[in-house]
Amino acid sequence: MADGAGAGAAGQASGPSGGSSGAGGPVNPASLPPGDPQLIALIVEQLKSRGLFDSFRRDCLADVDTKPAYQNLRQKVDNFVSTHLDKQEWNPAMNKNQLRNGLRQSVVQSGMLEAGVDRIISQVVDPKLNHIFRPQIERAIHEFLAAQKKEAVPAPPPEPESQDPPAPSQDAS
């Protein structure tokens, strides 16, 4: 039973707003152990808020259509669709939605998308992983955790001697 309760609490904290930990206050990410679901959720939310995932997506999409794996997959899908449609006998009463859904299912069941996407990932994403994405993610995580540590440590109270004495011009009035 305790495992189920723990999973539920972790699930609540993984929401976009960070959720509540049940302990009452906000969770200090720097105090969570590596791999903790709450820490992971907080980091992912931070990366999203910085726009890193959008940046990575744009970077990959800008590069994808130049890669042979994409061009090969596109050609395979085009040929598959042409062959599939050639086998259909056109009828004006034909339900186009059913035809479209049947074609979609055939493409998915063929397995060509899964294999083609895997090849695209290895040509587009994998080369960027260690040299582009990882350093940006690590930098963002370090900055996030450092900022959280600063918030968790209360600032020292101002020194009483640093207060300015009243200006003499006010006393002369």
From Swiss-Prot:
GO terms for cellular component: centrosome; cytoplasm; kinetochore. GO terms for biological process: cell division. The lineage of its organism: Eukaryota, Metazoa, Chordata, Craniata, Vertebrata. InterPro entries: BOD1/SHG1_dom (IPR055264), BOD1L1 (IPR043244). This is Biorientation of chromosomes in cell division protein 1. Component of the SET1B complex composed of the catalytic subunit SETD1B, WDR5, WDR82, RBBP5, ASH2L/ASH2, CXXC1/CFP1, HCFC1, DPY30 homotrimer and BOD1. It is found in: Cytoplasm, Cytoskeleton, Microtubule organizing center, Centrosome; Chromosome, Centromere, Kinetochore. Pfam families: COMPASS-Shg1. Residues 16-25 have a biased composition (Gly residues). Required for proper chromosome biorientation through the detection or correction of syntelic attachments in mitotic spindles. The gene is Bod1. Belongs to the BOD1 family. Residues 154-173 have a biased composition (Pro residues). It comes from Mus musculus (Mouse). Keywords: Cell cycle, Cell division, Centromere, Chromosome, Cytoplasm, Cytoskeleton, Kinetochore, Mitosis. Residues 1-35, 148-173 are annotated as: Disordered.
